[in-house]
């Protein structure tokens, strides 16, 4: 004692926290040890929620028993179903999703990825079929790197900037894990993958740096999707286990850095730090691969790109 970090839902605050603090202080007062608090840190995670359903008999209906027939929601017996509130998953309201069904359909890694990527861990997470399907699609996209690795050959190698971007992404993954901002770590992994894909499509990445990139990717994926991480690690020819590798601490090329404000229609949405020497094309590529910016311009038409060197990128969309 004390425990470094207590992680638990707010519903346990009375039983677990109150009693443990009471006994700690009682034992302190009795002279058994000199300790005021049993936990150094406290983190309360959010709940997993799901939409609720009720049929015309006022009975709760499980999500998997609901289907759309001619534009009307019905249960398995054909009775019309009404959509209720989004609430914490509970057996009483039958708004639960069987983990075995998810694992059998998508795999455990997909479930982990979706739950860690969709919202900050201190907030509630709404479970959706579209969300889990999108995560599954990304898992397959990650494994495609193994096939690309086997057949890849570079053209004109020019990958210094790419590697520096990837190093920065790796370091950001680490920073966000340490502060429990797992969704931000996931966003940086998306960014890593997008940058790597662009380099491969342009064939500017050397074979050695492709190997380096996939090794780093496998390691930072390990806390999120451990099974897929090992598959990628093995797929590029490693005969060890990825989980036994040391966590990467990347040294960034110590060139001058500048902060760039990214605007959409004149409104600042993100601020990033980049190498001062990066040319306009490289800056715009980095901006367009930023996950937050991609979400903001999704389904919109890009009209114009304005770049004020070392200061601002403004994307005009409609």
Per-segment meaning from a language model:
Residues 1-5:
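Short glycine/proline-rich turn/loop motifs
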Residues 29:
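Active-site palm subdomain of RNA-directed nucleic acid polymerases
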Residues 13, 18, 22, 32-38, ...:
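Helix-rich, typically C-terminal accessory recognition domains appended to large enzymatic cores
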Residues 155-156, 260-318:
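NTP/phosphate- and nucleic-acid-binding module
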């Amino acid at each position: 004692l004390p425990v470094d970090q207590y992680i638990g839902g707010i519903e346990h605050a009375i039983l677990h926290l109150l009693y443990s603090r009471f006994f700690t202080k009682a034992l302190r007062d009795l002279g058994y040890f000199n300790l005021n608090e049993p936990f150094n840190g406290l983190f309360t995670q959010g709940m997993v929620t799901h939409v609720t359903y009720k049929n015309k008999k006022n009975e709760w209906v499980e999500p998997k028993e609901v289907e759309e027939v001619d534009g009307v929601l019905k249960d398995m017996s054909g009775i019309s179903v009404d959509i209720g509130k989004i609430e914490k998953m509970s057996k009483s309201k039958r708004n639960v999703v069987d983990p075995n069904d998810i694992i059998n359909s998508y795999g455990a890694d997909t479930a982990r990825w979706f739950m860690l990527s969709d919202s900050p861990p201190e907030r509630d997470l709404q479970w959706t079929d579209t969300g889990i399907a999108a995560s599954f699609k990304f898992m397959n996209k990650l494994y495609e790197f193994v096939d690309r690795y086997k057949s890849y050959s570079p053209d004109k190698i020019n990958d210094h900037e790419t590697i520096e971007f990837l190093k920065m992404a790796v370091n950001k993954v680490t920073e966000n894990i340490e502060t429990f901002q797992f969704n931000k770590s996931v966003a940086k992994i998306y960014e890593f993958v997008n940058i790597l894909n662009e380099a491969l499509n342009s064939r500017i990445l050397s074979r050695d740096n492709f190997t380096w990139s996939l090794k780093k990717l496998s390691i930072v994926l390990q806390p999120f999707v451990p099974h897929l991480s090992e598959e990628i690690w093995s797929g590029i020819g490693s005969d060890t286990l990825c989980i036994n590798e040391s966590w990467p601490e990347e040294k960034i090329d110590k060139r001058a850095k500048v902060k760039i404000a990214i605007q959409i229609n004149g409104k600042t949405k993100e601020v990033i730090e980049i190498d001062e020497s990066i040319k306009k094309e490289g800056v715009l590529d980095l901006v367009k691969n930023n996950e937050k910016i991609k979400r903001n311009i999704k389904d919109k038409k890009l009209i114009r790109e304005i770049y004020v060197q070392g200061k601002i990128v403004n994307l005009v969309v409609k």
